[in-house]
């Protein structure tokens, strides 16, 4: 095989050491694309089409080199010529195709589908500016377009194009592909990203994400989740969703026909995984397309119901999409009669209005359509699936118990261990052998080393090295200096009240006041946040403002700053995560119990040797079961208790706000000290929210949270015992490999050859 050095010499006519970083990057990108282009596609009879509004794939250069088995070789060649692969990788722009856990999960799943040699492609949209790039200005979030599309990217233009009909016009699509490589696999899959031929980037200025939301032919794929605080925003999201599923459905039918399907047997050639409710219109669209090709309505419904499966990712009512019928009449009038007929069939069979597709207010419940007309409904962690069956979707579970199943989420160890933490991967190879790279369950062999002083010392050294690396990264990106000898306590996830970043911020206030009164911690503490708030989500932006204001206040206080530091990472993304996660000591997983479907950050931290501070929520429950009581720090009320509070309506924030331990903390939010660096309107609004509404019960768990976190800080000082817990966590993380998750999906749902 021609190595990279020869490739450079042959293509650029000069030696590797004479090339600039940019030349090396562009050549390495092309070299890797050519290697992956040469691989044949997986081509089983049946294919899974994983349709998702988001694919948070991260930078691909190192990931693809690892999966091609070329990473070490290329790294050594570069080093020998005076280059650093890490520096070369810095030049790569991160694709802006997702935002949170939903998109990152989709990316991990594609990696695992390819690694297992299964035939499965992703289907999504080619967003030009993603969600947005986050900047901080005046201690507030500022959103600007996240530019990532350049001529030199992983996107490969294709000849595939479809006509997508809307109410008043038809748009022509253009399909771009990104190769999805499996780990040490000789085949590949694809991520298909659809764009509009008529897109117009000039609608957007460089310093704002505002744009004309009515010019659909020009704006359709500009942004992920465009602001939907008005009707134009709602309509644009429906246009986007239909454009995505119509292209996916047309592609799926074409590919099945090419393989010999007569369409009556389409379910033998294709299965569609609906990732959250955004792709739900694929059901009526497939029925429509089959009808156009001469298949009777009843049979079309039967075919589609045998080939669509739905993953529920949330129990938050606001996230289960319900579109007004009159909006659908405007955007996709040709689907409305189909949806009405599907609804009529449900209503003829079941009198219970709570299971109708169209409710009494004329809103179409997308999840209801998915459940009635799909063959599988899965939750993404054991607790989440139980809540779906016992409360949120109880009425559906009673009708279709056989459709419901759990598929606990997972993460790809290629990116989150081999790439993000190569020193730890090397230690694992030396200690337990390399089998874990292909079979994550083999990590459990590490348990035998819990009391091995040499292994614990090596783990400690690796953690210190990763803290140093993060410290350099934060200095380069934001000019922030952190104390590498401090405890790194990290909460990184999208900003949402149910994830309770505000509770962590109240802890910061507690610690600040504690230090001011003379209680100096045994070791300095660095509390790090990262995450974006949706532009229309005011309270989440207020929480960011509180965190940034506290950061400034503490940094300027010579009494407190040597002992406590607060950092908010700007524009948190996959790249930032690969620096933050390996450096972490304490993993904050503090959502209100019952609200987080699964979480995958908790798994990434566990795998990289952080200990979890968490509620009994989502996959924290399964982490707790795997590692045992002594190796995790659990606090707060349990999900059944929380659900009971909601049912009885007996949680009163204002009563909790008056408690002796809580009052000084919430009052500080609108104190003169904070107002000196903060915005009065934002801080007072947040104070009012916390002390009168507090819908996600921050104050309910706050005292237990503070006590548990303080205990964790004390335990950190017993380094041997702490590192023994770290060993157990890493050893038990194998269950959370996305390879295991995908094996489960395939065995129970997709049944690919």
Predicted features, each with a name:
Residues 1-753:
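A conserved ligand/cofactor-binding region detector
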């Amino acid at each position: 095989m021609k190595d990279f050095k020869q490739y450079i010499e042959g293509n650029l006519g000069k030696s590797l050491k004479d090339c600039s970083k940019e030349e090396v990057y562009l050549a390495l990108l092309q070299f890797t694309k050519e290697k992956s282009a040469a691989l044949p596609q997986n081509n089983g009879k049946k294919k899974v089409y994983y349709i998702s509004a988001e694919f948070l794939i991260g930078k691909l250069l190192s990931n693809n080199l690892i999966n091609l088995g070329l990473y070490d070789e290329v790294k050594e060649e570069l080093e020998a010529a005076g280059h650093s692969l890490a520096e070369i990788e810095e030049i790569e722009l991160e694709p802006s195709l997702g935002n949170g856990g939903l998109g990152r999960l989709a990316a991990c799943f594609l990696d695992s589908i390819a690694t297992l040699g299964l035939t499965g492609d992703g289907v999504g949209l080619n967003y030009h500016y993603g969600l947005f790039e986050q900047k901080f200005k005046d201690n507030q979030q500022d959103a600007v377009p996240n530019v990532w599309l350049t001529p030199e990217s992983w996107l490969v233009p294709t000849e595939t194009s479809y006509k997508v009909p809307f109410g008043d016009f038809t748009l022509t699509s253009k399909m771009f592909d990104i190769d999805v490589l499996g780990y040490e696999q000789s085949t590949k899959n694809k991520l298909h990203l659809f764009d509009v031929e008529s897109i117009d980037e000039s609608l957007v200025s460089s310093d704002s994400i505002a744009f004309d939301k009515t010019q659909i032919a020009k704006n359709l794929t500009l942004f992920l989740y465009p602001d939907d605080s008005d009707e134009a925003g709602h309509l644009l999201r429906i246009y986007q969703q239909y454009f995505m599923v119509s292209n996916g459905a047309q592609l799926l039918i074409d590919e099945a026909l090419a393989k010999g399907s007569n369409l009556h047997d389409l379910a033998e050639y294709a299965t569609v995984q609906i990732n959250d409710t955004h792709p739900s219109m694929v059901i009526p669209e497939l029925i429509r397309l089959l009808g156009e090709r001469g298949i009777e309505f009843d049979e079309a419904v039967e075919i589609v119901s045998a080939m669509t499966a739905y993953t529920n990712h949330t129990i938050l009512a606001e996230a289960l999409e319900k579109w007004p019928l009159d909006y659908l009449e405007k955007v996709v009038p040709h689907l409305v009669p189909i949806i009405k007929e599907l609804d009529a069939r449900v209503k003829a069979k079941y009198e219970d209005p709570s299971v109708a597709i169209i409710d009494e207010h004329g809103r179409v419940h997308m999840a209801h359509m998915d459940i009635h007309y799909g063959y599988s409904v899965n939750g993404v962690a054991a607790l989440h699936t139980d809540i779906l069956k016992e409360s949120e979707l109880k009425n559906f579970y009673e009708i279709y118990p056989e459709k419901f199943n759990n598929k606990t989420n997972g993460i790809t160890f290629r990116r989150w261990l081999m790439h993000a933490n190569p020193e730890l991967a090397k230690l694992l190879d030396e200690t337990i052998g390399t089998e874990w790279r292909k079979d994550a369950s083999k990590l459990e062999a590490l348990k035998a080393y819990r009391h091995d002083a040499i292994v614990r010392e090596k783990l400690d050294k690796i953690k210190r090295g990763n803290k140093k690396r993060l410290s350099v990264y934060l200095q380069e990106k934001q000019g922030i200096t952190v104390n590498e000898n401090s405890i790194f306590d990290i909460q990184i996830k999208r900003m949402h009240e149910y994830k309770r970043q505000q509770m962590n911020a109240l802890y910061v206030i507690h610690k600040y006041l504690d230090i001011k009164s003379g209680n100096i911690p045994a070791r300095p503490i660095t509390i790090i946040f990262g995450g974006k708030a949706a532009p229309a989500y005011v309270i989440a932006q207020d929480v960011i403002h509180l965190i940034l204001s506290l950061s400034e206040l503490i940094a300027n206080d010579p009494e407190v700053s040597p002992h406590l530091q607060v950092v908010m990472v700007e524009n948190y993304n996959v790249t930032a995560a690969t620096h933050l996660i390996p450096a972490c000591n304490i993993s904050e997983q503090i959502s209100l119990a019952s609200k987080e479907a699964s979480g995958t950050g908790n798994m990434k931290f566990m795998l990289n040797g952080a200990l979890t501070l968490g509620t009994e929520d989502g996959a924290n429950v399964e982490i707790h079961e795997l590692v045992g009581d002594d190796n995790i720090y659990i606090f707060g009320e349990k999900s059944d208790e929380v659900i009971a509070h909601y049912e009885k309506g007996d949680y009163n924030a204002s009563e909790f706000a008056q408690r002796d331990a809580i009052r000084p903390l919430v009052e500080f939010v609108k104190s003169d000290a904070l107002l000196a660096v903060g915005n009065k309107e934002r801080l007072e609004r947040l104070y009012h929210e916390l002390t009168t509404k507090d819908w996600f019960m921050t104050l309910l768990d706050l005292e237990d949270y503070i006590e548990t976190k303080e205990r964790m800080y004390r335990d950190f000082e017993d380094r041997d015992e702490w590192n023994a817990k770290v060993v157990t966590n890493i050893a038990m993380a194998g269950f959370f490999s996305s390879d295991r998750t995908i094996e489960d999906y395939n065995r129970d749902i997709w049944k690919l050859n």
